[in-house]
Amino acid sequence: MQRKSNFRDVFYVSDGTAITSETLGHAVLGQFPIEIHQTTHPFIETNERAKQVKTLVNQSHEKTGIKPLVFYSIVIPDVKVIIEQSNAHFYDVLNVLVEPLKHDLQLEPEPQLQRSHSINKDAASYQDRIAAIEYTLAHDDGISLNNLDQADVILLGVSRCGKTPTSLYLAMQFGIRAVNYPFIAEDMASLKLPAAIEPYRFKTYGLTIDIERLVAIRNERYANSDYASLEQCEKELHKVEGMFRREAIPYLNTSSLSVEEIATRLLDISGLKRKMC
C-alpha cells in the first residue's frame, strides 16, 4: 500500500554510534513539512549486518512504494558499498564535508584517526560528564546551596519554567555544573536573591515563561490547584521578572524554546565554553 507522498521512512546508519548522522538528519528534516518514521542502526561494521540493513531499507520501499531516506556515516568501504546498493535516497553526512576538506588541506583522510582521537579523550570526558551530572543532581531544585564556588551556572526562576531539564542537559551534553533554584509562593512577599547565591550573582541567569504556558504545565500535574491558577502564575512571574530587572540578572523566556535551544542560548549569553563535544 502506497502512503501519502509527504511521509518518509528514514534510516540513520553508521559503522560508529550513528550520533552524527542522526543529529544532522534531524536538523535537515526539521526544515520540511513531512511525517517521518525513523530507525537508527549503529555499529554496522560487517558485511552481514550491512546486508540486514539493506534488506530493511528495500522492504520499506516495497511496502510503501516510496524510496526511504538514508542518512549515513560510514568509513568501512565494503559496508558502504552494500548500503548504497539499497533502493533509497542517500545522504553521506561525512563525505559532504570530507571531500572539500581533502581538497583544501591537500591531505588524504585517515578514518582510523577519528577513532584514536576519540579513545584518547573518552576517559577524561566521561569523568567530567559524571562529575557534572552528580553536582547538578545534588543542586537541583534548591536541594543544596553548598559549594556554589564549583558551579559554572546558577539558574533561577519560578517552579516549572524549565530549570531542571535545562540544567541536566547542560551537564550531560557539555559537562557544565549547573545549580537551579526555584522561587516559590512563600518567597513572593519579600522576594530577593538568596544570601548564599549573592556572592555568585555573576553566575546567575533567570528563566521565565509566558503565563498561559506556565498555567498549562502546572495543571498537568496539579489540576485546579491554587499553584496552577492563572492568578498565582501571573503573580509569581510578575514578581520574579521584576527582581531579575532590579538585580540586573539576565533572563530568557523559555515558552517557545526546546531544552536544546535554551541551553545553547544560555551558553551564548553567559560565554560559558562547552567542556566536551
Swiss-Prot record:
Name the catalysed reactions: [pyruvate, water dikinase] + ADP = [pyruvate, water dikinase]-phosphate + AMP + H(+); [pyruvate, water dikinase]-phosphate + phosphate + H(+) = [pyruvate, water dikinase] + diphosphate
Among PANTHER family, the record links this protein to:
PYRUVATE, PHOSPHATE DIKINASE REGULATORY PROTEIN 1, CHLOROPLASTIC
List of residues binding ADP: G157, V158, S159, R160, C161, G162, K163, T164
Concerning its family, UniProt says: Belongs to the pyruvate, phosphate/water dikinase regulatory protein family. PSRP subfamily.
Family matches, as Pfam families: Kinase-PPPase (PF03618)
Query: Origin, by domain of life?
Result: Bacteria
Listed A to Z, the keywords are:
Kinase, Nucleotide-binding, Serine/threonine-protein kinase, Transferase
Q: What is this protein called?
A: Putative phosphoenolpyruvate synthase regulatory protein
What role is this protein assigned?
Answer: Bifunctional serine/threonine kinase and phosphorylase involved in the regulation of the phosphoenolpyruvate synthase (PEPS) by catalyzing its phosphorylation/dephosphorylation.
What EC number is given for this enzyme? 2.7.11.33, 2.7.4.28
Q: Which GO terms describe its molecular function?
A: ADP binding; ATP binding; phosphotransferase activity, phosphate group as acceptor; protein serine/threonine kinase activity
Could you list the residue ranges that cross the membrane?
A: none
